[in-house]
Every structure is written in structure tokens, then in C-alpha cells.
């Protein structure tokens, strides 16, 4: 029996030795030592270079004191509050959108979920500018015409009713038309000699009715009424109404009223604005001498107005025209407009 085999069976022998294994072991040890030295150098460098910086930071913190800490704390609190508000807003809007589209989300899957959470763009419906309150005019313009439909009862005088209406309302009345019947009419026909009037007895149908009525203190000569009538046998008569115009049944008059009018004298004179200045500069004795020419002009104007309106001579005493030196503000609420 071989002694080597018998001995090997009793105890194991060490592995064979190779030179390459020894070299690898030395290299690993050297690398490990180099790494350990590098780590020590880095720790030493960091320890000696960061320690002064830490000391400086501590000094700055101590110098800043509670002011820096408070500002940092306030910034953090504001940031956290803003984040909370944004999160609450997003969660609220997403919840509303999910509640609106909840029925569609079950079958839509992931792609439909993104569409449900997408907020619509543009201006929401119903957010247009609110309509403004309408402008209501509570007062009529002074130059506006107001239309009137006047019904005059049986047996009433049309001329007297229109004059009373203008006086009580303090508005000028322009008669445009009239329908109905009248009786016992006194008129002056055109082309007849001055002072001649015609009295018509019976019932007549109104074909045309026109005229104007101004409230006092306007001159009475500015008021007048013209009428055209149809008789029972087909004859047509007309002219300026001189006396009363009595209704035979209800009469409907269409008229327009106005509150602003200017009284003018034609033809206009160049020295019209200089006459009041010259009259005001004279003394009391000269006033009588200046009054005679206006009186002559007044008589001429009265005669011309009587011829135009068809008034008989016995009615001229009731007509009083204003003297020419007085302006139109005495007879109407507003003055004559400037030229």
C-alpha cells in the first residue's frame, strides 16, 4: 500500500501553490490601500475646508436672527396656502366635470376620462353684457308737436271750445281737419267787399276745417278759423268764420298743439334792434312825439289783418296789435331765435 495514498485518505492536502495567485493578491491589497488613502485625504480636505464655511454660515444665521427665520417661514406658509388653494380649485372643478359626465365615464375608458376632465375654452354661455335700462323721456320737448283728437258735443261753439283749450293749456293749437255737421254759420267769403258777412241758416256738413288758436297774451288777430261747408242740395260755401260755429251733433276735430312759438313782424327792418335803444335814451317829454308813428302803423296793420281775416269794421275795436317797439317775449314764453 502506498504511504502517500494512505495518508491522503486520512487528511486532505493543501491546494497547490501558483505564483499568479500571489500577484493578484498583492494587487488587490495595493488597490485597497490606495482607495483607503484617497478616502482619508477627501475626509481631511472636507473637514478642513467646510468647517470655516459652516462657521461663517452659523455667524450669518446668528446675525440675521429671527428676521430671516420669520421671512422663510412666511414664504413657506404662503407657498403652502397657494398650493392648497390650487389643489382645492382643481379638485372642485374636476369633481363638477366628473359629476356632469359621470354617465359617460363608465364606458369611455382612459381616453374618455381625459376628455371629461378637460375644461371648455372660450366665454361661458350667458356671460354677455347685461342689457341696460331703457332711457325714458318724462318731459316733452318744447319744440315738439302733440296730436289731439277732440270731440265737441252737440250745440257747442267750436271756436269758443278751441280758444278755451288753448288758454287753459297755455299751448298753441293748429286745427288740421274736422268732421261733423254745424248749423247757423256766419262767415265772410273771399272777394266780398269789406264788412260784408254771410249768415247761413240750416244744417251743413263740414268739408274742410283749418285754423290756429294762440293763448294770451298773444294778439287775438293771430287766432282764426276757416271752414268749407256742403249744403243739402249740393252747394259748397266757405270762408272765414266770423261768429260762432255751433255743432249739430258731435264734431271730431284733429289738431296739433305746440308750446314754443315766436311772434314775428314781416317784413323785417334793418334797424329793428336799434329802436329799443333809441327809445330808452330819450327823456319823458320826447316819449309822446315818438308814439305817434307807431300808432299810425298799428292802424294800418289792423286794417290789413282785418282784410286778411275777413273781420267786419264793427269788430276792429276788439283787435289790439302790439306796438312794434316791443319784442315778442311779451306774447310768448320764449323769445325769437337769433338769425
From Swiss-Prot:
Domain of life: Eukaryota
Region feature Disordered, mapped onto this chain: 1-132, 273-339
Record's keyword terms, sorted: DNA-binding, Nucleus, Transcription, Transcription regulation
DNA-binding region per Swiss-Prot/TrEMBL record: 118-130
Keyword Transcription: yes
Keyword match Endoplasmic reticulum: no
Ranges of Gly residues composition bias in the record: 102-113, 278-291
Domain PPC: 142-279
Role according to the record: Transcription factor that specifically binds AT-rich DNA sequences related to the nuclear matrix attachment regions (MARs).
Notes on the domains: The PPC domain mediates interactions between AHL proteins.
Protein name: AT-hook motif nuclear-localized protein 26
Organism: Arabidopsis thaliana (Mouse-ear cress)
Lineage of the species this protein comes from: Eukaryota, Viridiplantae, Streptophyta, Embryophyta, Tracheophyta
Amino acid at each position: 500500500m502506498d504511504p502517500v495514498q494512505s495518508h491522503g485518505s486520512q487528511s486532505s492536502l493543501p491546494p497547490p501553490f501558483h505564483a499568479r495567485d500571489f500577484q493578484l493578491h498583492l494587487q488587490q491589497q495595493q488597490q485597497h490601500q490606495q482607495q483607503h488613502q484617497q478616502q482619508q485625504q477627501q475626509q481631511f480636505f472636507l473637514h478642513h475646508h467646510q468647517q470655516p464655511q459652516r462657521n461663517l454660515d452659523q455667524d450669518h444665521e446668528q446675525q440675521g436672527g429671527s428676521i430671516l427665520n420669520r421671512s422663510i417661514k412666511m414664504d413657506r406658509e404662503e407657498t403652502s396656502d397657494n398650493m392648497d388653494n390650487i389643489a382645492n380649485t382643481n379638485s372642485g372643478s374636476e369633481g363638477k366635470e366628473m359629476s356632469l359626465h359621470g354617465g359617460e365615464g363608465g364606458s369611455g375608458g382612459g381616453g374618455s376620462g381625459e376628455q371629461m376632465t378637460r375644461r371648455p375654452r372660450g366665454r361661458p354661455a350667458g356671460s354677455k353684457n347685461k342689457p341696460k335700462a331703457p332711457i325714458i323721456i318724462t318731459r316733452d320737448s318744447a319744440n315738439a308737436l302733440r296730436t289731439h283728437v277732440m270731440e265737441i258735443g252737440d250745440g257747442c261753439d267750436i271756436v269758443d271750445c278751441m280758444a278755451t283749450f288753448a288758454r287753459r293749456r297755455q299751448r298753441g293749437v293748429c286745427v288740421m281737419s274736422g268732421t261733423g255737421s254745424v248749423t247757423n254759420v256766419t262767415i265772410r267769403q273771399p272777394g266780398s267787399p269789406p264788412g260784408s258777412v254771410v249768415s247761413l241758416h240750416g244744417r251743413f256738413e263740414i268739408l274742410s276745417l283749418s285754423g290756429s288758436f294762440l293763448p294770451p297774451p298773444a294778439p287775438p288777430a293771430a287766432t282764426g278759423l276757416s271752414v268749407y261747408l256742403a249744403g243739402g242740395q249740393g252747394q259748397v260755401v266757405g270762408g272765414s268764420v266770423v261768429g260762432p260755429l255751433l255743432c249739430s251733433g258731435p264734431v271730431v276735430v284733429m289738431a296739433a298743439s305746440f308750446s314754443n312759438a315766436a311772434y314775428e313782424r314781416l317784413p323785417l327792418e334793418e334797424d329793428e334792434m336799434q329802436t329799443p335803444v333809441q327809445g330808452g335814451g330819450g327823456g319823458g317829454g320826447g316819449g309822446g312825439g315818438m308814439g305817434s308813428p307807431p300808432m299810425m302803423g298799428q292802424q294800418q296793420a289792423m286794417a290789413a289783418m282785418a282784410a286778411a281775416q275777413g273781420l267786419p269794421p264793427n269788430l276792429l275795436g276788439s283787435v289790439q296789435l302790439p306796438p312794434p317797439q316791443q319784442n315778442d317775449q311779451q306774447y310768448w314764453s320764449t323769445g325769437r331765435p337769433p338769425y
